[in-house]
Amino acid sequence: MADNSIFLIDIDKIIKEKAGKKASRVPRFVVSYLKRIVHQDELNGFLRENSDKVGVPFLEACMNFLDAKLEVEGIENLPEDGLCTFVSNHPLGGQDGVSLGYLLGKHYDGKVKYLVNDLLMNLHGLAPLCIPINKTGSQSRDFPRMVEEGFRSDSHIIMFPAGLCSRRQHGVIQDLAWKKTFITKSVETHRNIVPIHFEGRNS
């Protein structure tokens, strides 16, 4: 029987990989809590059922699994010529990332790449669309090269310039300050910058 573990979420394994020798100090009740709040068993059921899907078909399966309702205004304004860097606010976390990748991936025949948290590389169906960013440890030496290759590829780039999900600030949920990387790299590689704004809420 084939080993499908690469397709699954394994909180124990991720903690060991991210924390190294310190992983043994993480209390078991914390690990169990993490498994519950990320719905590890439920998600792994979804991943097993969709292990044959990669890229945009995987994102479409995610949309169906989440029962996400997406209303789009201005899709007719998406550029048809040239390469773009699409930048967006990040209010809903994974859901807006999945939605944006699905929408743009469908429109541009799968030619999209995300700059994302490297933990998402654990998702086999999403990994081919990802340029990984390490949020918890030292950045890979290959990171500058991967970003450069991404921006110089024939894929459109998707970025959330705040780098993190929106936070409540002064009673309002809003993005942190946007980093300017998307501007400098887009100028260097002659890409148009297209802003996208999300409004929504989790049910």
Locate predicted features:
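Membrane-anchoring hydrophobic helices of lipid-metabolizing enzymes
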Residues: 1-84, 97-99, 109, 127
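Soluble catalytic domains of membrane acyltransferases
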Residues: 69-203
